[in-house]
């Protein structure tokens, strides 16, 4: 710690910070542009000038840039010095000489860091009357608008895109005061994290194109704290709504998970919430048509159907909340509840839960991952399955430069010096995969092989680290040497990290990862293991229904029994199983009841569809891959805008159905009631209630506001329908109001922050006001509750070492996961569809020659009653005997995993 004096007041600060960080952490306002908490200092903008004095007696002082000045003990500075204030005002004026002053038509207006800093410095009149520099804008793809004339040359964009995110197709061109930030030519930005430019840029150069199509100011949107639904990482988000539509998603700071950044799938994949074909009223099947019926009529028909069936079973979902899955299990009974994922994935998820519970090795948060000094990724393409992890791994490998900087006593915020000192030295990142990955540019070594051979390498590494681990006796000399190199790199680390997951559907890979983590822990290292699930609530479903059976068991029961009724919640069975098998099973049912918020293939076969609420229209709890229970809150009430909309939370439909069926009062009327019931009945979920406050929370006696206090048009937005002002929607399930009435701001500590705003800070930089220190954690504590923590337990060594992969006449299907299109919900979003690459079938050239197939030609194949025609791509990296398919895309079910195809043939276009 260090003692500094600011405008005559004494403060204790972290001596490792620069003065700008220190002042912002103290809650003092110092304007800045080029600095960012995640990017460090380069001193490019000169905006953060303060007056520094030699001692308490110095009255003259000198101007220094606070972002480039360390917080040494005994530092005396002044923010309010007149010379410093005038200098900062002049800097803004210089920045604005070429700015178009187009705030009224700029999409950044009202959430603009440049506006905030201009007001903060007091610059309020223009003196420049000459020709302004102009630029030609670029088309950067479906996600981001480009307006270069607003640029102030702060260099944040290229520092984030190239230095932080590892992108290569955005740069800066030109010299002196005529520089251009963009691509060499028009084209879609290639980075999976390009959307963060929208928040990194302090002006309106890079803006959200998906928001442009239905634009409104930040102060006119309704927000709620929420959780990304598009993978198992559980990033915190702030969705914004207007007129009953989700308009955009902003990052919600979480000190342990996503920090300041999201992946593009999470930021832009929300379009499925607004689709016009969503079921919004109960739908009754009448021949080939679906007829809208009333809520009471739907519940009575559903209850009659279940009452008259010979048995009722339920199929849950890893994309549904804990509460909805729990309500379904309570309706049908634990023995009749099935988890709704295929057997291979369910076995992997159960094993992953077992390892996290009893393995004795901690599971890292994303922030913890960034501190790892050696990383092994076994068979999991994290860029495609959990992209935000890939961004953290990029920061982790740069830790070598930070280590060198510490040895040389260079402050870590001096990023240019740290980069120069590092000279591209990195901590080792080791990856086993089927083919190339997006992390190959920072990898130390890699293995391209079938999953069985990848697992064998993992088991061999564990044995080399600890001879007590099972040995691989028939490993080839080349792989034995590679295992030795990798074991040495991991064994020499202090904080090694092992990553695996269920996307490969390989138990052997997960068990090999566990063995390696145990061996590293046994050597006294701070080892950690991250096991990546496939969907937002995969781990939560495993914790809730650890003894339940997979989808295949449900289909087998339907095939074996007559007269069953099936209730599914937020699950499209056709995505997870062969079409002919699902068709046959559904045809045998006496009644099919589907509760979902999307018009899926399963819903089209339903006798009755009950319209579920999407994540923006409901409350719920998810458990992310590290075992952190996190609550997402309802953003808006659809029925407020249109009384004909009858969507309900999945658990509310099920509670009402059970009450109708049993002729009893509802078991749960509020979210708090069902959450308490879930926590009480499942020991693993006993502490899930600590993930968020209950509906009774008040701050200074007030509920919390979902809308900024400047929200406009509330009394007139529906005047075209009725001149009488409707009462705002009421929320019995959370402490939030559907209005601007209530508490909003940063003065009182609260972990559930709907939107970032503080007096004078309207941009995402306002998160500084909510943190214990800039870039640290929220003052009230990061949201969520870890349900799984490492114990002193130690699992036995896993010994089921697979045999080497051998080619056969038929080709084994492996998944070529896709970030855009591979996840069910975001793949329905039009903007994500515009970003999806063409689905292809991938073969090794030798296999292509064996089937007489040529690259670029169409390949036809059949499986499970479906027929596909996909263009062929050849890859020498993919091992012989394998065929790569983008499962989940183009109707390719995930059950194709590790199936065998022998009928590949050339298709005539």
From Swiss-Prot:
Coiled coil: none
Leader peptide range in chain numbering: none
Textual note on the cofactor: Binds 1 [2Fe-2S] cluster per subunit. Binds 3 [4Fe-4S] clusters per subunit.
Iron found in the keyword field: yes
Enzyme class, broadest EC rank: translocase
Catalysed transformations (reactions): a quinone + NADH + 5 H(+)(in) = a quinol + NAD(+) + 4 H(+)(out)
Keyword set, alphabetical order: 2Fe-2S, 4Fe-4S, Iron, Iron-sulfur, Metal-binding, NAD, Quinone, Translocase, Ubiquinone
Binding annotation for [4Fe-4S] cluster 1: 99, 103, 106, 112
Domain (4Fe-4S His(Cys)3-ligated-type) ranges: 83-122
Domain of life: Bacteria
A Pfam family that the UniProt record links to this protein: Molybdopterin
Binding site for [4Fe-4S] cluster 2: 151, 154, 157, 201
InterPro entries in alphabetical order: 2Fe-2S_ferredoxin-like_sf, 2Fe-2S_ferredoxin-type, Asp_de-COase-like_dom_sf, Mopterin_OxRdtase, Mopterin_OxRdtase_4Fe-4S_dom, Mopterin_OxRdtase_prok_CS, NADH_UbQ_OxRdtase_75kDa_su_CS, NADH_UbQ_OxRdtase_ferredoxin
One of the protein's GO biological processes: respiratory electron transport chain
Subunit composition and interactions: Composed of 13 different subunits. Subunits NuoCD, E, F, and G constitute the peripheral sector of the complex.
PANTHER family in UniProt: NADH-QUINONE OXIDOREDUCTASE SUBUNIT G, RESPIRATORY NITRATE REDUCTASE
Protein's job: NDH-1 shuttles electrons from NADH, via FMN and iron-sulfur (Fe-S) centers, to quinones in the respiratory chain. The immediate electron acceptor for the enzyme in this species is believed to be ubiquinone. Couples the redox reaction to proton translocation (for every two electrons transferred, four hydrogen ions are translocated across the cytoplasmic membrane), and thus conserves the redox energy in a proton gradient.
Family: Belongs to the complex I 75 kDa subunit family.
Annotated protein name in UniProt: NADH-quinone oxidoreductase subunit G
Organism: Shewanella oneidensis (strain ATCC 700550 / JCM 31522 / CIP 106686 / LMG 19005 / NCIMB 14063 / MR-1)
């Amino acid at each position: 710690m260090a003692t500094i004096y600011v405008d005559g007041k004494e403060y204790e600060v972290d001596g490792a910070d620069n003065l700008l960080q220190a002042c912002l952490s103290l809650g003092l306002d110092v304007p800045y542009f080029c600095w960012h908490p995640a990017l460090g200092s380069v001193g490019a903008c000169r905006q953060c000038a303060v007056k520094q004095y030699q001692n308490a007696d110095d009255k003259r002082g000198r101007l220094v840039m606070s972002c480039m000045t360390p917080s040494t003990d005994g530092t005396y500075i002044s923010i309010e010095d007149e010379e410093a204030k005038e200098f900062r005002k002049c800097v803004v004026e210089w920045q604005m000489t070429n700015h178009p002053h187009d705030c009224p038509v700029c999409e950044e207006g009202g959430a603009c860091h440049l506006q905030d800093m201009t007001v903060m410095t007091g610059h309020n009149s223009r003196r420049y009357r000459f020709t302004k520099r102009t630029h030609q804008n670029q088309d950067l793809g479906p996600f981001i608008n480009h307006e270069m004339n607003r640029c102030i040359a702060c260099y944040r964009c290229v520092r984030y895109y190239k230095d932080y995110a590892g992108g290569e197709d955005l740069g800066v061109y030109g010299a002196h005061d005529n520089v251009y930030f963009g691509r060499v030519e028009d084209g879609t930005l290639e980075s999976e994290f390009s959307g963060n430019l929208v928040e990194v840029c302090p002006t309106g150069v890079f803006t959200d194109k998906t928001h442009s199509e239905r634009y409104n100011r930040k102060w006119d949107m309704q927000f709620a704290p929420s959780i990304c639904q598009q993978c198992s990482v559980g990033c915190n988000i702030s969705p914004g709504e207007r007129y009953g539509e989700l308009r955009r998603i902003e990052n919600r700071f979480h000190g342990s998970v996503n920090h300041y950044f999201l992946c593009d799938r999470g930021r832009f994949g929300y379009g499925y919430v607004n689709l016009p074909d969503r079921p919004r009223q109960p739908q009754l099947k009448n021949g080939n048509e679906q007829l809208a019926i009333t809520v009471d009529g739907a519940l009575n028909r559903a209850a009659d159907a279940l009452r008259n069936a010979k048995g009722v079973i339920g199929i849950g979902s890893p994309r549904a909340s804990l509460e909805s899955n729990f309500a379904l299990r309570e309706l049908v009974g634990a023995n009749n509840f099935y988890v709704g994922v295929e057997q291979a994935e369910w076995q992997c998820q159960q094993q992953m839960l077992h390892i996290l519970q009893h393995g004795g090795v901690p599971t890292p948060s994303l922030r913890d991952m960034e501190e790892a000094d050696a990383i092994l990724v076994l068979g999991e393409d994290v860029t495609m399955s959990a992209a935000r992890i890939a961004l953290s791994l990029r920061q982790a490998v740069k830790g070598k430069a930070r280590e060198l900087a510490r040895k040389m006593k260079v402050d870590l915020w001096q990023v240019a010096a740290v980069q120069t000192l590092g000279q591209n030295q990195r901590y080792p990142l080791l990856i086993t995969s089927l083919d190339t990955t997006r992390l190959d540019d920072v990898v130390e070594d890699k293995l391209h092989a079938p999953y069985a051979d990848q697992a064998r390498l993992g088991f061999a590494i564990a044995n080399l680290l600890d001879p007590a681990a099972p040995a691989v006796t028939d490993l080839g000399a080349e792989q034995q040497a590679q295992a030795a190199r990798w074991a040495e790199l991991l064994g020499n680390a202090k904080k090694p990290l092992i990553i695996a997951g269920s996307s490969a559907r390989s138990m052997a890979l997960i068990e090999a990862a566990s063995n390696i983590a145990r061996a590293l822990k046994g050597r006294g290292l701070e080892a950690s293991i991250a096991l990546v699930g496939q969907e937002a609530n995969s781990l939560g479903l495993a914790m809730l229904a650890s003894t339940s059976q997979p989808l295949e068991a449900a289909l087998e029961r339907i095939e074996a029994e007559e007269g069953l009724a099936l209730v599914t919640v937020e699950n499209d069975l056709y995505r997870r199983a062969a079409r002919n098998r699902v068709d046959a099973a559904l045809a045998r049912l006496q009644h099919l009841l589907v509760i979902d918020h999307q018009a899926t293939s399963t819903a089209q076969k339903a006798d009755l569809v009950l319209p579920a609420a999407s994540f923006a229209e409901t409350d719920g709890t998810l458990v992310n891959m590290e075992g952190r229970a996190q609550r997402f809150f309802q953003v808006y009430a659809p029925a407020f805008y249109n009384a004909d909309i009858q969507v309900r939370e999945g658990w509310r439909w099920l509670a009402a159905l059970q009450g109708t069926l049993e002729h009893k009062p509802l078991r749960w009327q509020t979210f708090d009631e069902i959450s308490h019931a879930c926590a009480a009945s499942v020991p693993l979920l006993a502490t899930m209630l600590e993930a968020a406050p209950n509906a009774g929370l008040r701050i200074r006696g007030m509920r919390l506001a979902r809308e900024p206090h400047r929200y406009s048009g509330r009394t007139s937005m529906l005047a075209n329908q009725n001149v009488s002002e409707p009462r705002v929607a009421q929320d019995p399930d959370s402490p939030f109001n559907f209005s601007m009435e209530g508490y909003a701001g940063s003065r009182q500590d609260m972990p559930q922050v709907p939107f970032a705003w503080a007096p004078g800070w309207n941009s995402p930089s306002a998160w500084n006001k909510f943190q214990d220190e800039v870039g640290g954690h929220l003052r009230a504590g990061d949201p969520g509750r870890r349900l799984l923590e490492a114990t002193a337990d130690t699992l036995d060594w896993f010994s089921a070492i697979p045999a080497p992969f051998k080619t056969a006449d038929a080709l084994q299907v492996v998944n070529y996961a896709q970030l855009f299109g591979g996840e069910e919900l975001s793949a329905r979003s039009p903007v994500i569809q515009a970003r999806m690459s063409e689905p292809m079938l991938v073969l090794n050239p030798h296999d292509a020659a064996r089937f007489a197939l040529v690259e670029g030609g169409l390949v036809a194949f059949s499986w499970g009653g479906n027929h596909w025609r996909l263009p062929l791509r050849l890859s020498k990296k993919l091992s012989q005997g394998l065929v790569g398919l983008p499962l989940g895309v183009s109707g390719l079910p995930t059950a194709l995993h590790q199936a065998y195809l022998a009928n590949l043939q050339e298709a005539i276009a």
